[in-house]
Every structure is written in structure tokens, then in C-alpha cells.
Amino acid sequence: MASYTGTPFNKYKLLDDAYRASGIFETGDALIPHPRETAEKYVRRKNMSYFINYVKPIVDAHINLIFKNEPVRQNTSSTYDLFLNDVDGNGTSLTRFMKKATIRAKLHGVEFIVIDAPIIEQGTIVTKQKFIDDRLYPYLYLVSPSNIEDYVVDKFGRLIYIKYSVENDTIDKDGNKRVISEDWTLTNDFCTRSIDGNTERFENTIGVIPMIPVYGTINNSDDLIPQSDMYAIARTNLALFNACSEWREITRSQAFNLLVYPVGEDDDYEDVDSLNIGTSDLLLYKNGHQQPEWICPS
């Protein structure tokens, strides 16, 4: 029989896969097998599954209208324009970055923007040209709520401590890909970064945590990380994904009738263990006086 562990789907993976029609919906692993379903039939049903996406159109309908026109920004400088056109060191404009952040905030309920800057060694002379060439101005990156390990807010709801992890893909000296996990702790006074057991501590010179939560809707809860209003829709999409597959399986089963054949008392009726009830097998029964016929589920 097809195996089923009963492990719940990760909430944020379900949301991401539903939005992109990828992951568990692409492979069919979102289908929950029937208790008596064979592994072969379950694999076949996964290969025949199809996904009707309701999550992405709803999210995009809310977000695309906001970014229909380029925002008007005034009183900018030449150095600030550098940042506007490249906020992450990968040539991403601020508008494009904020649209990505807003989509993920709508999908996850909240998304965190971290503001950081390269470390400049003490005594280094930074000219304007060096500032530009070495990209020594701040950069942004996103942190999903699934990466938040712990946090503390005061009685006013202000974030005063947060711990999170991010993965950073690099190439080692042998040219092989290496995934490094960075564990960050941010407070109003200091920040720490741990990589492979080595921890660095930095003074927080700005006095506030350089992380901004972006919410997909007004957060009326007391939680820094609220429940996503898209989660119920993603769960409904999951249920419909399973229902469509099950209904298609019933339709296919009814499309091919099952031959039932009566067997007399003197007929050989010993080797029947190899026969399985299904549309592709023969169903034998004893003491029947009717003629062979085809039946199908009603």
C-alpha cells in the first residue's frame, strides 16, 4: 500500500508551492493516498494530477495594482540614486525589490527586510569613487517568517530582540558548491553572526534593530508574526487538488467495466489470490447461475 506518515505540510512551504504551482503540487506529493490505495496506483494518480491555482491570482491582484506605476521619489542625491537602482548588489531596483517583498508579505502574512552595509575597516580612506566601485553603501535582503527562530517585543509592540538564520551559497577553494548557514542575533545594542561555530559580535551604532516587518494586511494581533490570510485559501487549494484527483480516479474507474464470472462447484477456484478487485481484473464468485456480465461503480 502507498505509505502515508501523516506529517502536516509545512505552512510556509505550502503557501510558496501553491503560489508558484511547484514543489508538492508539481510532484503530486500534496495528494494524500487512500488507506487501501496501492503504491502503483498512487504513483499513477500523482503523475496524472493537475493543479488549478487560486492563490497566485488573488495575491497578484492585490499587489500589481500598487506597483502599476513607478513611485515618485523626490529630493534624491546621486549616491542615493545608486542605491535606488541596486539595493542588493545584484542590480535589483528598490521598486522591484519592494514588489517582491510585498508579494511575499501578502503570501506569508509578514516578510522582514534587513538593512545592512559592508564592513569598512577602521582607518580606511573612503573616496566617493571607492564608495561607488566597492559598493560600500547599504544593501537589503529578505527574511521569511519561517527563518525566524526567536524574538522579543516590548509592551508597546516594539521589536527589541530577534534571532534568525539565512542560507548563503558559496564556492569553496576546490570549486564545489557549499551552503553556509548564518545565524544572526539583533538587538538595539549589538548584533552577532555565527558561522560554523564561529561567532562575531558587532556594536549596533544606529541604536535600533535594522529590520523592518512588512505586513500583507493590517496586523490586528499581538504577534509579530501573524497568521497569513492566504493560508485558508492555500488549504482550500490543497483540498481541491486532492478532490480533483479523486474525482478523476472515480471517473476513470467507471470508464472501464469489470467482468464478473460465475464459477461452478466443480470448477477450479483455488488460484484466486492473484486476482485483485479492480477495473483491470476478473471477479469470480461461486454458485452463480447468471451469465457473465460487466459491472461498474454506480
Where are these regions (language model features)?
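Intrinsically disordered, low-complexity boundary segments flanking structured domains
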Residues: 94-103, 126-129, 135-139, 145-153, ...
